[in-house]
Amino acid sequence: MATPAAVNPPEMASDIPGSVTLPVAPMAATGQVRMAGAMPARGGKRRSGMDFDDEDGEGPSKFSRENHSEIERRRRNKMTQYITELSDMVPTCSALARKPDKLTILRMAVSHMKSMRGTGNKSTDGAYKPSFLTEQELKHLILEAADGFLFVVAAETGRVIYVSDSVTPVLNQPQSEWFGSTLYEQVHPDDVEKLREQLCTSENSMTGRILDLKTGTVKKEGQQSSMRMCMGSRRSFICRMRCGNAPLDHLPLNRITTMRKRFRNGLGPVKEGEAQYAVVHCTGYIKAWPPAGMSIPEEDADVGQGSKYCLVAIGRLQVTSSPVCMDMSGMSVPTEFLSRHNSDGIITFVDPRCISVIGYQPQDLLGKDILEFCHPEDQSHLRESFQQVVKLKGQVLSVMYRFRTKNREWLLIRTSSFTFQNPYSDEIEYVICTNTNVKQLQQQQAELEVHQRDGLSSYDLSQVPVPNLPTGVHEAGKPVEKADAIFSQERDPRFAEMFAGISASEKKMMSSASASGSQQIYSQGSPFPAGHSGKAFSSSVVHVPGVNDIQSSSSTGQNISQISRQLNQGQVAWTGSRPPFPGQPSKTQSSAFGIGSSHPYPADPSSYSPLSSPAASSPSGNAYPSLANRTPGFAESGQSGGQFQGRPSEVWSQWQSQHHGQQSGEQHSHQQPGQTEVFQDMLPMPGDPTQGTGNYNIEDFADLGMFPPFSE
């Protein structure tokens, strides 16, 4: 049976595209056709371009599969690129140590957008502050720690929405000058365009390239420009803001430090009538305005405060690169200035203080060799020092030379220089010099020393009072005048109760006993060592409140007379040494109280026989041989020039023992250290609770202070 191809071989051949040469045998032609149809499946890629005409039957399906794979690959690349940009925009993602996966990036981005829109979890809104602090207290603490002020500005118009009251101590401007104005009015005119770029959120806000600080590569702005529209994108810029001229008296005292810092961080002295500016570093975020759940009043929307975004930032004073020596008073004169040179000595930078030191403007010195201003005799010395400091690499080298000022005078300058090296290449970049006017520095130091010396000499000596003593006669015949007015002082208010407790009858009673103590122990012709004038009376004076200064005398009557006189004159406190008042009948220096003193005072044996032994007048002997077992801490005269070390309650017992020795010459029996002594024949003390009784305990005086210390 014949096949269709065998019946009509030419028709079969006509269905095959292209020209095919058929052999004579029909079956051979049919086999040749089938082989031709099966060949593209095995070696289609190695066929010549002419043979691709045979593949048009399966071509559309193959090309569609290849196009689908390419489209998927491009879509994945774009998604990876967008997620990478999203990761850079979200602060929480960029802060991670390792790169997060795509799901983490999307989750963090959603959380960040919710927090920016104010739709986050309300239960955690108050977790950022302690429970015991209010919002106002927290705001003041943050602003005080930041040493700046908080302000909110509309992004589109620049109108000030809010400013904290701390703007007054920082910029010396009240809040009223900021409210109702724009931030463009508060900054320097040259910084307006820079501020407008920071407030703008459009795609075309900035052009150029951006340096990626993480990788160190420079990227085009088009890759990062989408960050400008992010509501939580960070802003950090430096600008010059206008300062006010409010008087300092209206500011609190704790803001004086901030005011000094603002003057030091200023841009130098300004001309009369010109506005003064301070360098302010502003850091903050662009946020949505108004926040979620808050509506803007109609009057605010009419004036243009209905912006979609706002800048919330904190402004802090920025330390300027040019040091300014002007203080608040403006009286300090600089004595030094900084300069920067290359290795050849050419000046590349000089700070403005050179105007006050050498008279030149900074532009007059830039680009010139420092040797041009040096004295010809010192040029070789200065050149060698520059060569040496380059070799030292970082070490400081000082040199003194004569510098020619602008008024053609030679000024002695001390220059301390060192080199700055590039940390990567270890090459010397430049030389930094500190130039000091030696003469002016010495003058300022001398003035400071004189001021300190004057401050010590102007010490008020009225704080060291001396009682107004009556006029007496020195043993040499020279009169002793009364104390000057500088030694006068009112009664100490600490002992007002004690003075108030003294009645008129007590004063009269004590003054009546002054007649019995009129005799003198020493004759007027007895020698009195002159070296005693510089001796401190702290070792021979007993200080008791109410009975100010009692020096030992020959009898109890003289002591009581002295007490009465001092009570009428006022309260006295000793702080050290004072000029003595020798030769006074009522106050005589006794050898019995010369503890630690190296000046023996001769006494009349007839009138002073009980204490005229060498043991009483010797500086190293015991002043009270009969009381050696009672008061070991009080009568130890081996402590030269020392203060009393004994208990205050034992002073009266020794005073009474001296009284008995002078009147009757009887020897006291040795008493035990803890035994109580009774004073039968002693007048009661003013304000004594035991007044009217014959017996009382000497421990009642234990709380009376002896020689209270006073700092000079």
Swiss-Prot record:
The keyword Ubl conjugation does not apply. The modification Omega-N-methylarginine is found at R42. Residues 63-73 have a biased composition (Basic and acidic residues). It is found in: Nucleus. Residues 134-209, 323-393 form the PAS domain. Residues 1-20, 35-74, 573-712 are annotated as: Disordered. Keywords: DNA-binding, Methylation, Nucleus, Repeat, Transcription, Transcription regulation. One of its GO terms (molecular function) is aryl hydrocarbon receptor binding. This is Aryl hydrocarbon receptor nuclear translocator 2. It comes from Rattus norvegicus (Rat). The lineage of its organism: Eukaryota, Metazoa, Chordata, Craniata, Vertebrata.
